[in-house]
Amino acid sequence: MAGKAAAPGTAVLLVTANVGSLFDDPENLQKNWLREFYQVVHTHKPHFMALHCQEFGGKNYEASMSHVDKFVKELLSSDAMKEYNRARVYLDENYKSQEHFTALGSFYFLHESLKNIYQFDFKAKKYRKVAGKEIYSDTLESTPMLEKEKFPQDYFPECKWSRKGFIRTRWCIADCAFDLVNIHLFHDASNLVAWETSPSVYSGIRHKALGYVLDRIIDQRFEKVSYFVFGDFNFRLDSKSVVETLCTKATMQTVRAADTNEVVKLIFRESDNDRKVMLQLEKKLFDYFNQEVFRDNNGTALLEFDKELSVFKDRLYELDISFPPSYPYSEDARQGEQYMNTRCPAWCDRILMSPSAKELVLRSESEEKVVTYDHIGPNVCMGDHKPVFLAFRIMPGAGKPHAHVHKCCVVQ
């Protein structure tokens, strides 16, 4: 039986993981990753589990196809998952289509003890009972059980295509209907550009794209239900403020390219102490002399610079973060806690929810202290992103009967 014997309700586990690194070094990283993932499953024993992956297949999808198949097969048939007798897997494998390819992968697992679970058919506009294990890939656009979109081209910085978009599914469990949205937003292309303004130009691009997703999932086409949006939001700390704080007493040296006069490097040195270098900043270099600042007390002193979610405070809620920045970790299999010096560490990977979904989660917290929001594999190399998870329970009677949904209820 899933769930702790005494705890009522339906145990839910939501996980987001940017897995791009796993397919570059499958021998070492995949084993680590799966072991840590299974440990979280074992600890929380969910009845319903959703795993949202970004950059599925790595940087070169075509070259990674065999590793992808092996990873999916392992997840579906492993001993750790044997009690999950129903599954839905949606893999965007359409890598030849620039206009459509998002490299998103969404996995949903249902425990054998879970009864009365339905998935929404977006074309027929009705719920269907979930049975068996099914994998969908290649052309997800024609699959009625989900909505998939890549962002419009004019949303992309300089209109250059990259693998960014979202996949939405809708479920009804224990008389509660909710959307689960797998999302991947735009990254910071240059540390130097991010440093120029506060907020950065990149945060504005992410703001626009996330607003687009939220507008899509609450538009008039379908009934409104609670929603959880989890993925790689690429949220970054406000770079200008962070640098000012980390280098308060530093002097700045600017290095320019000889031919173009373009700024290519910033060097921040202590005013005294032999003018020791504190921080070096380049397009893809963020080399701060003391990484401990990002790990001390899980880096929570830096949360004041994590501001990108504030513009959505009426539409998206998040539990308090008590884990260190989830990116960019070293991809060296021997380094589990070291950050790469490519970017300022940030909480890119998040699990966010609508106000009504928040009520659903917090209701279980008040009755049974069973809500956990944390990262996976704190001491183990999991690739450049640490996965992040939310575990909670849907309490009996949490859903309210709703006339329009057959055998399903909506949290108001």
From Swiss-Prot:
Coiled coil: none annotated. Its main location: membrane. It catalyses: 1D-myo-inositol 1,4,5-trisphosphate + H2O = 1D-myo-inositol 1,4-bisphosphate + phosphate; 1D-myo-inositol 1,3,4,5-tetrakisphosphate + H2O = 1D-myo-inositol 1,3,4-trisphosphate + phosphate. InterPro entries: Endo/exonu/phosph_ase_sf, INPP5A, IPPc. Predominantly expressed in heart, brain, and skeletal muscle. In brain; high level in Purkinje cells. Its EC number is 3.1.3.56. One of its GO terms (molecular function) is inositol-polyphosphate 5-phosphatase activity. A lipid is attached at C409 (S-farnesyl cysteine). GO terms for biological process: inositol phosphate metabolic process; negative regulation of phospholipase C-activating G protein-coupled receptor signaling pathway; phosphatidylinositol dephosphorylation. Residues 410-412 form a propeptide. The keyword Cell membrane applies. Signal peptide: none annotated. Isoprenylation at Cys-409 is required for localization at the membrane. It is found in: Cell membrane; Cell projection, Dendrite. It is a lipid-anchor. Keywords: Cell membrane, Cell projection, Hydrolase, Lipoprotein, Membrane, Prenylation. Gene3D superfamilies: Endonuclease/exonuclease/phosphatase. Pfam families: Exo_endo_phos2 (PF22669). GO terms for cellular component: dendrite; membrane; plasma membrane. The keyword Endoplasmic reticulum does not apply. Phosphatase that specifically hydrolyzes the 5-phosphate of inositol 1,4,5-trisphosphate to inositol 1,4-bisphosphate, and inositol 1,3,4,5-tetrasphosphate to inositol 1,3,4-trisphosphate. Plays a crucial role in the survival of cerebellar Purkinje cells. Belongs to the inositol 1,4,5-trisphosphate 5-phosphatase type I family. Interacts with TASOR. This is Inositol polyphosphate-5-phosphatase A. The lineage of its organism: Eukaryota, Metazoa, Chordata, Craniata, Vertebrata. The gene is INPP5A.
